[in-house]
């Protein structure tokens, strides 16, 4: 497959995924999940693997105009889709990042990292967890939800790096806290 074909397939795959997420979101309001994450007005959030922004918009609404969401995804169409949704919802507290790991944010600048249905797809999850650790503030939180993994798989991946400690679970969301090294 040449470069054009693989990029075209990737774009089609993203559009199909976005379509199915739109249907999912109609039946399962993303805000209901986000309400369970301990988000505060003014928080700085990294949503890694944001896709078309299903959870980005509710996060931005919950943290308000004094907060900031950094919506990161590997696919360039994710950035376009999130920007359009932010404009449609009159939200100016969302920045997008296209990346496969490094997010180019300052060290200790993020209150919480949110990973929803992403952990299973991270080929080198240790590198990602190190990057999340780097950008999280002291005692920052990592929230993970991934229906592809059971509880043991989620915990073992996150805890294997010794960068986070397990805090607890709220419904399908697992909370971890950055540890001091």
Kindly give the residue locations of the regions a language model identified.
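Conserved alpha-helix/loop element of class I SAM-dependent methyltransferases that forms part
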Residues: 24-43
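A short acidic, Gly/Pro-enriched loop at the edge of an enzyme's catalytic core
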Residues: 102-113
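Conserved SAM-binding strand-loop segment of SAM-dependent methyltransferases
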Residues: 90-101
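A short glycine-rich, Lys/Arg-flanked "PGG" loop and its adjoining helix->strand segment in the class I
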Residues: 60, 126-141
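Conserved SAM/SAH-binding beta-strand->alpha-helix loop
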Residues: 75
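Core SAM-dependent methyltransferase catalytic element
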Residues: 162-181
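A short SAM/SAH-binding and catalytic strip from SAM-dependent methyltransferases
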Residues: 111-125
């Amino acid at each position: 497959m040449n470069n054009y074909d693989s990029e075209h397939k990737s774009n089609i795959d993203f559009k199909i995924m976005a379509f199915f997420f739109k249907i999912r979101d109609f039946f399962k309001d993303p805000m209901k999940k986000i309400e369970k994450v301990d988000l505060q007005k003014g928080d700085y959030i990294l949503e890694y693997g944001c896709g078309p922004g299903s959870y980005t918009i509710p996060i931005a609404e919950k943290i308000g105009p004094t907060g900031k969401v950094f919506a990161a995804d590997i696919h360039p169409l994710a950035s376009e889709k999130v920007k359009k949704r932010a404009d449609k919802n009159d939200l100016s507290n969302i920045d997008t990042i296209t990346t496969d790991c490094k997010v180019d944010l300052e060290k200790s600048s993020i209150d919480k990292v949110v990973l929803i249905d992403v952990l299973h797809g991270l080929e080198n999850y240790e590198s990602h967890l190190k990057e999340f650790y780097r950008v999280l503030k002291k005692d920052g939180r990592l929230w993970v939800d991934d229906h592809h993994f059971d509880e043991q798989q989620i915990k073992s991946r996150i805890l294997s790096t010794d960068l986070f400690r397990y805090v607890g679970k709220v419904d399908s969301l697992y909370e971890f806290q950055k540890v001091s090294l």
